[in-house]
Amino acid sequence: MSHRERDRDRDRDSDRDRDRNRYSRSRSRGSRSRSRSRSRSRDRNRNRDYNKDRSSNRDSYYNDRDYKKDRSSNRDRDYYDRDRNRDYKNSSSGSSSGGGGGGSGENYTVKSSSYRESNSNNSKVEIQKQENISKDYFIDNKGVNNSIERKDNIKNENNNNNSFDNRKAEFNNNSYGEKKEFDNNNNRNYHGGNSRYVNNNNNNNNNNYNNNNNKSNYNGTDFFEYRKKLREEATCFSVYERSPSPPKKGELEEIDDQFLSNKKKSKKSRRKSSSNSDSSSSDSDSDSSRSREKRKKSKSRKDKKKRKEKKKHQRKSSKRSSKYSDSDSDSDSSFSDSDYSDSDRSDSEGRSRKKRSKKRSKKRHDHHKESVHDASMWEEKVEQQTQTLSNRDIGPKPISEVQVGSYGGAMMPGEAEAIAQFVKENKRIPRRGEVGLTSEQIASFEETGYVMSGSRHRRMNAVRIRKESQVYSAEEQKALAMLNREEKAKRENRLLADFRDLINTKLQAD
């Protein structure tokens, strides 16, 4: 049993099990599941046919692959036999042609090497040459000289080919050496005048590794000192600033002395500030005092605002209490006049009286102003005559109910109302693709011959006509209903007027 048959049987078994499970599930369900099972069975049959075609294609692929394998295995054997026979034939034909030449004295033989060992192109060329030689030799008796010339040409061609092959082999053999020489020349040109420096570096490195010494041949100095001298002697300036050099011993001592003197001065200033509290403080103290003064000023401003507000409230309260205080003060003054005589009053009492009289006059003047102001503020308003509740509506007006479905069915929500707005304004209803244009522009386009729907959109055009006719019919029905209502109202009004006239005539007659 081959692998192809095994794969085919496995696929068939898996399909059968899957079909059996699906069939058992579909039987357990109701009528709705049966319809589903039918569609599934259709899909299953389709997949089965697809798998069959796939399996047949797979078999053809496997057959082709096996055929190619067998062919490739036998190809080498066939090529070997063919080449061997070809070499044998060429060798035999070359020897016979050489013997037939006679006069030339040269035998053109082919090497008895296998086809794999010799170059295929060279062998083909040699075979063609041998065939040409035999043809030229056996044309006629006069063709002997021609055949000899042809042989000479063939010799020259062989020599040229051999010389070219030899040159190519020499180039391949010598390519590595030539490349090496080229690299060496480049290195020489690159170093140029710096060869002395390079040699010195190499020598110095060798000395360092051999002797294990840190010093080199930089004029008896270290490498770092030598580089430092080069930097100092250099005329070019660096873009970046040099890092500051560390201070020397004398400079360090001067810095320490300055630091100690500053410390002593700060101690003396502290003592002076403690003894003389009124003396000016340092810059930092002055800054802090300024900030404190600013804070105090802001606080004082806030306090002033609060005091002003309190004074306003007190003035209002004093104005209200002045009504009662004036009457009390009048009674006190009358009592004092009766008790004391004019002769017993001293100058001090006279002065105090003058002050009191001035205060009273001011208070009365203020009270008069307030009374005038209060009279203008507290005028009695006349009550307006309230309308009867029966004549006016109370509360918000009810929202007008939109009759849903009055335009017919098969319409998008809000679509019929939008179309109805255009109908009320006696405008053309815009179609699909006409949103950016006005109704006048669309009408002008249609008059010139442009049609927005076209022959491909007949169904869409039919839907549009149906919707528009629904809206038109609904609007016409509404208009008819309004006319009927108006006519009905007119009739009722006429009847009422006739009844009133009859009643009035009867009353006048009585």
Swiss-Prot record:
UniProt cross-references to InterPro entries, sorted A to Z: NKAP (IPR040466), NKAP_C (IPR009269)
UniProt-annotated stretches for the region Disordered: 1-128, 149-220, 239-401
UniProt GO cellular component terms: cytoplasm; nucleus
GO molecular-function terms, A-Z: chromatin binding; mRNA binding; rRNA binding; snoRNA binding; snRNA binding
Low complexity bias locations: 112-123, 184-219, 274-283
GO-annotated biological processes: regulation of gene expression
Pfam families assigned to the protein according to its UniProt record, in alphabetical order: Nkap_C
Residue stretches of biased makeup (Basic and acidic residues): 1-22, 40-89, 342-351, 368-383
Positions with biased composition (Basic residues): 23-39, 262-273, 292-322, 352-367
Compositionally biased intervals (Gly residues): 96-105
TM spans (from-to): none
Family that this chain belongs to: Belongs to the NKAP family.
Name recorded for this polypeptide: NKAP family protein
Organism in which the protein naturally occurs: Dictyostelium discoideum (Social amoeba)
